[in-house]
From Swiss-Prot:
Function: This protein is located at the 30S-50S ribosomal subunit interface and may play a role in the structure and function of the aminoacyl-tRNA binding site.
Gene3D superfamilies: 2.30.30.790
InterPro entries: Ribosomal_bL19 (IPR001857), Ribosomal_bL19_CS (IPR018257), Ribosomal_bL19_sf (IPR038657), Translation_prot_SH3-like_sf (IPR008991)
Keyword Ribosomal protein: yes
Protein name: Large ribosomal subunit protein bL19
């Protein structure tokens, strides 16, 4: 009984067209930012290093390097503040979490590109 109710609430809070991307992909995340009474879209570009959760609580982590410093940001997949997620490049990975990229610098951060068939 409770699981059925929880599933209904979970499905009601999910986006119908959730973005499709994998771990290791380089993505542009377009998020809505409110500044006072104005709304604008901010783009965060980086590599998806992990996904966690399920259903409406699913999150993904994007990492990029800014001025020599690593910056990570977590986004909810089904958030209404996420306008869209564009996949720029698909990377080949053999891990579910790419936390080892935190220790790498420069060209070592790059991943091999996945061939598209």
């Amino acid at each position: 009984m409770n699981n059925a109710i929880m599933d209904m609430v979970d499905k009601a809070n999910q986006k119908e067209n959730a973005p499709q991307f994998d771990i290791g992909d380089t993505v542009d995340v377009h998020s809505k930012i409110l500044e006072g009474n104005k709304e604008r879209i901010q783009v965060f570009t980086g590599v998806v290093i992990g996904r966690s959760g399920k259903g409406a609580q699913e999150m993904f982590t994007v990492r990029r390097i800014v001025a020599g410093e690593g910056v990570e940001r977590k986004f909810p997949v089904h958030s209404p503040r996420i306008e869209k997620v564009e996949v720029k490049r698909s990377g080949v990975t053999r891990r579910a979490k790419l936390y080892f990229l935190r220790d790498r610098v420069g060209k070592a951060v790059r991943l091999k590109e996945r061939r598209r068939v």
